[in-house]
Every structure is written in C-alpha cells, then in structure tokens.
Amino acid sequence: MDFVVDYQTYAMADTATPELPEPEPRLNLTSDAQSQPTGKLDLQFKLPDLQRYSNNNATLPVDNDGAGSKDLHKKMTHYAMSSIDKIQLSNPSKQLGQNSQDEKLSQQESQNFTNYEPKNLDLSKLVSPSSGSNKNTTNLVLSNKLSKILNNYTLINYQATVQLRKSLKVLEENKERLSLDEQKLMNPEYVGTLARRALRTDLESQLLKEHITVLEEFKPIIRRIKRLSSSVEKIQRTSEKLLSNETNEVPTNNVVLQEIDQYRLKAEQLKLKKKILLSIRDRFTLNQVEDDVITNGTIDNIFFEVVKKVINIKDESSFLLTLPNLNAGNALIMGVNEILEKTNKKIFNYLIDFLYSFESSSNLLNDHGTTEQESLNIFRKSLVFLSSDLELFNELLKRVTTLRSKSILDEFLSQFDMNSTTSKPIILSAHDPIRYIGDVLASVHSIIANEADFVKSLFDFQDEDLKDTPISILQQNKTFLKGIDNKLLNDIIQSLSNSCRIRIEQIVRFEENPIINFEIVRLLKLYRVMFERKGIQDDSSIINNLKSLEDISKNRIIGYYEDYMKQTVMAETKNSSDDLLPPEWLSEYMNKLVELFEIYEKTHAAEDEESEDNKLLSSKNLQTIVEQPIKDVLLKQLQTSFPLAKKNEKEKASLLTIEINCFDLIKSRLQPFEGLFAQDDDSRKITIWVCDKLKEYTKQMLTLQIKFLFENTGLDLYSNLVNMIFPVDSVKDELDYDMYLALRDNSLMELDMVRKNVHDKLNYYLPQALTDVQGNLLFKLTSPMIADEICDECFKKLSLFYNIFRKLLIHLYPNKKDQVFEILNFSTDEFDMLIGIDH
C-alpha cells in the first residue's frame, strides 16, 4: 500500500512549476555509480547488487536484455528500463504556449535521453541531485519510492515481491467495484497524493473490519475459557492436593469430596431426567404408519383414531410445561399443533367436497365404497373434530351458508318466472291480494321445511356421534354442536328475508281496505308462527320482516280511519238535515268500525299472547279510532252547527237532541263489543265515557223539558220560589209544610195572584201537555226508551209539584179551601190522568 500511495514518484514531474514541492527522498538512493570516481558515467542501468551489500564483494555485470531470463536480477533490470522508457514517452510538451525556458528544457531532456548509451546509464545520475543538467535529469526520472524499492531490493525476498504484484493485480481487478479513478490515482500532483492516501485509508479500514470480524468469532471461545478456567483450576488444585496426600486416607469432612459427591448425585439426577424425557419422547410421537395416514390417508375411522391420538398427546403433554426448562414442552406442543393444523385442513377440504357432491350423488355408495349412512357418520365426526379449529369451522359454516342460500334463493325466485316450464308461477292479482301473499308465504314455508330436513340430516348430532370424541372437544363444543343445525338453518334462510319482504310489502303499502289489511295481518301472523315451529328463531331477519309487515298493515288499518276522518268528516261542517239525526258520516264510520270489530273478535284469541303495544286494537288504537273522532270531530261539528245553543233554549234543545241521538247510536253500535273494550282499564274508559256523555245529555234534556213544561203550565215561578225555601222532593209529611209559612207574606202567593198566573195556563195546556211533549219535543229522539224516560220523568215532576203546591196553598189558607180548589181545579187523580201517569 506504500507503493500505491507514493506512486507519483514514478512519474516525471515538471520542476519548473513552483506550486508543487519537490519530493523528498525518504531513503538513501546512492547507486554503485555514485560511489565510483567521477568520470564518464556508464549509462547502463544496474540494479543494486545484493551480494555486494551483504558480503562486500565486487559488483557483477547485469544483462539488460534478460527479460526472459530466469535470473531475478535480470528481470528486475528489464522492468526498470521499461519504466524509464515509458516515463520518457509519457511526458512530452503539453501545450504550445509554454515559455522558451520550458521548451528548451524539454528539448534538452529529449536530447539527453537520446544521447544516452546503455553502457553510460547510471541510476545515481537519474535520481540524485547534481549541478547543471544532471539535476533536472535526476528529478525527472524516478520517484523516491522507486529508489527505495530498488535500493532495498536486497532486503525483500522473493515472496514479498510476489505478494506486492498480487496486491497490485487485486487492485487492478477490483477498480470498478472500488470505484477507483485511475487517472486521479496516477496523477503525480497533490490531488493524486490525496486520492492515493484516501485509497490507502479505505483499504486499511476494510482490512481492519475483516480482522475484527475474525476476532469476533473467538469471543465465545474466550468467554467459555474464562468461565471454565476457574472450575478447571479448582479441579486441578484439588486433584494435586489429593495426590499429594501420602497417607492415602481421605478425611470424612473433606468439603471437596462432599462437593464432588453432590455433583455426582446431580449427574445421576440428570441421567434419570434424560431417561424420563427419552421415554416421554418415545410415548408422544407418531410412528411412520400413523404419519402416513395423516399425510396420505383418506378420511375414515382409522384416520380419526390417529387424530384422536394426536389430540391425546396434546392434552397429556401439558405437564411438560411445569418443568423448569420449557423448551421440550413448547417443541412438543408446537409439533402437535402443526399436525393438527394439517389434519384440520384435510378435514375441511373433505367436508367441502362432500357438501358439493351430497346432492348430486345418485347412488348409495360413494367413491370409497361406504354406504350413505356411513358417509353421514364420517361427515358428522369430521365436523366434531374440525370444531376444535374455530377459524376453519366458521369458514366451513360460511361456505355451507353461502352454498345453500344461493340454492334456495334461486328456487324461490324461479317461482315468479313467467317463462318457467317446471311449475306454475305465482302471479299477483289485484282482485285477490290475500291469495298472492298466501302463495308467497307458502312457498317460503315449503323451502324452510325442505331446508330444515336437509340441515338436520347432516348437522343434527346425536349422542352416538359424540361417543368417541376426545373429552377436550366435548367439554368445549358439545353444547354448540348440538345446536349447530338450528343456527345453520337460520343463517341459510336469511337470504329469503328481503326477497319475501319486497313481494309482500308492495301489497301491504298500497292496500287501503282495512278488512283486507286485517286479513293480511292474520296471514302474516299465522306463517310467522309456522316458521318459528320449523326452527326459525324469533330474532331472525325473516321473522323481523314479517313483524314489520304486520306493523305496517296495522298502521294502514288505523291510518285508514284517520284518513277517513280527515277527508270525509272535515268536509261536512254542519248538520244539513232538520230531523236532528246523527250525521251520515257517523253512521258510515260506525259501520266500518263494527265490521272491523266483528272480524277482530273472531280472531281475538290469536292476540292474547302479544303485548299491549303490538295488538291491533290496543287501548291506544281504540282511543284513536273511537274516542278521538267523537271528541275532536263530532262534538266540535255539533257545536258549530248550533252556535246559539248557549243563548237560545230552543237551539239548546235541538243540540241536546242530536247529541243524544249521536251518542245513543255510538253506544248501541259499541255495546255488542263490550268484551273488546274490557281488555284493560284504558279501553274500558272509552265505553264508560260514551255512556256518561249520553247520561249527561239526557239529564240536560230532562231539565230543559221540565223547565219548558212548568213554563207552559205557569208553575215555573212558584216552582222556583218553593224550591228556594225547601226542595219539593224533600217534603214527606205535614210538618214539612210549615217550612213554607214564610211565603204567606209574599205577594206572589196570594190566591188572586196565583189565579192570574196559573189557572188559565194550566187549564189550557194541561189537556194537551202529553201530546205536546211526546209529539213535538221528543219526536226527534231516535231512542224511544230515552224519550219515554224523559217524558215520564217530566210529568212525574209536574204531578209531584202540583200536588204539593195545592196542599201548600191549603196549608197557608186553610179557610179558603174552596178558592184554592177553584184555582187548582184538577184533583190529583184527574191531573195524573191528563198527563198520563199511572199509579
């Protein structure tokens, strides 16, 4: 590497250039010619004589033409002459613009080298500084390094020379890989020096790294030697001590021997452990035949016996994990897991192939000659063993679900294909939507039944299928495996939920008839129960879709009555007829309600198990379709039709009449369905409210008719006066009449005033009172019972007051009985007879 770094000394330098320093000789370059007397120099190039430097003998002549000679001195002489010739040829004038001094120097150099004769060529004149022309010649020939190599040739043996050439050759071969810039490295200037030094640094660093790498390999050995050296030295000292004992008697309390005995015991324990581990290894391994069954065997009972053995090995090898060293247990369990993973993949592929070929197989024997029942048993056993690998087991269930879902969906959709030749398609008819929905649901039910049979034939595990299963699998998956058929059935049927819902929903959402919608609700509920009996879970999507369709139908039923009230009733703002009968819309509306109630009561038992919110005629819905139309529509409409009812008693009588007629109609239509309204307190309150309103209006009508009757007979003023002091209804005996003695001072109670106010009106109106009340006032009441009740109560009140008022006047004026009988000229019997009261 020194040769590489200082290679610039081999080149010819421009001594006229002042920028670069002149190379300094590092070694003595004095040649043989320099030691001779000055005179004519022999320019024949001569290598330093090794023999002369070693033995002080005379210099031997060298043949310059010995390139092919076997003598090493002749070869080196030839190489040196060749280098000088190359230096001479590679350093001509570099540019035309040089000054005359440089040109002169160049010519002088050329002339000097030309005039040199081989015999006068001396190395000392080429490399040693001298005066005149010899100085430039010496500085331009060889570098200090070449002189060093040549002068020290006697110190370098043949192997070193070979190694030097080999190093240069290696650099030449790897210059591209090392990215060597040849021109820069051969540059004799300072840049070349830096490049060669950098190359040397890189080479030394790389060499140092290689040496460190080699030394790193000795570190473990050194550490092991250091770790064992103390023990070895201790053993050595102990052995020397024992051997030096002349008595050959070993003391019993020798600590060293006790320690050796302990080590011996430990060695025996280790041997025992090794024996146990070897026994365990022999026990927990598969032989070659079993391994071949796992790798190349078919899925049969023999295969499952081997798998069972592998699982038992895994279960029984858990105690190895209790050892201080877990490597054995971990290695065994890892190997067993690899075998189980291989077997599970093989079982998985077998199950997939079996599923694809199960439906298509037409004979009872499969490719392996087993019967169909045996194949099913192997299939179930394969499922049991595969259940230990949840990932593959779930993937199998997904494959089964996907395969069967596509199959049943294609079967379902094919029934709506109008071009189908295999079966009659399901056609939607506008005149019979119930039949269409029934056909759709019947088709789904048939598919569910067939699929349930298929799934149970493959995935319904019995105790016989699980009797030979390893305990570890049964403990983890027995419950899950026994319910896998139901889970698979539900997963497969989910593919029908959306298609079924779409075909039914297009009917439900556009059907307005509440009776048809109610039939749809019944049909959906019926098939929902049938689906659940086939194993479909209550929370599955197809059941949820049927429930949502039921809710839509129920909402359509309730919405129909709400829309009816909005569209029909709101258009009729007042009662157009004078007969004070209920509005026509109320009769029609009640007819529609009765029609719904009748069909609902026939199937009321089907909703007994449903919650209150899911019932069609729940208390909330009953309030919506019964109570709210009466409160929000009917009563407001009647109040609007008779705006003067609060001021005019005639108008009020008409309002009360139509209100009584309306509520009597409502009560009569709802009365047959008391059981429907008796399902809870909220529903019961609706009918109670209707009856209370009817009683309220009847009572108001009674009060109003009594008032009219007393006004027509002239007794209204005295009725108010008498009742103000003491109610007439409370008079029981003669003593009660004393309560009215204060009336004697009232001018209205004078007999002449009574005659004036009562006698004429009473005698005029009383004969026609019964006809007037029945014919004119109560004729417009549609209920004869209510009319008779009001009529009877009015005349009873009138008869009672007339009788008490007559007795009161006699009590007040006992001396004027004849005058009293004259004014109130009807006896009690006559009065009652005229007003139609029977005793």
UniProtKB/Swiss-Prot annotation:
Q: Identify one Gene Ontology CC term for this UniProt entry.
A: Golgi transport complex
- Which Pfam families does the entry link to? COG6_C (PF20653), COG6_N (PF06419)
**Predominant location of this chain?**
Golgi
Q: Which UniProt keywords apply?
A: Golgi apparatus, Membrane, Protein transport, Transport
Q: Where is this region: Disordered?
A: 14-38
**InterPro entries documented for this protein:** COG6, COG6_C, COG6_N
Instruction: Look up the record and give one Gene Ontology term from the biological process aspect.
Output: intra-Golgi vesicle-mediated transport
The entry's localization annotation reads: Golgi apparatus membrane
**Membrane topology type, per the record?**
Peripheral membrane protein
Q: Which SMART domains match?
A: COG6
Further remarks about this protein from its record = Present with 1720 molecules/cell in log phase SD medium.
User: Tell me, what does this protein do in biology?
Assistant: Acts as a component of the peripheral membrane COG complex that is involved in intra-Golgi protein trafficking. COG is located at the cis-Golgi, and regulates tethering of retrograde intra-Golgi vesicles and possibly a number of other membrane trafficking events.
Can you tell me which family this protein belongs to? Answer: Belongs to the COG6 family.
Record note on quaternary structure: Component of the conserved oligomeric Golgi (COG or Sec34/Sec35) complex which consists of eight different proteins COG1-COG8.
Q: What is this protein called?
A: Conserved oligomeric Golgi complex subunit 6
What is the gene name?
COG6
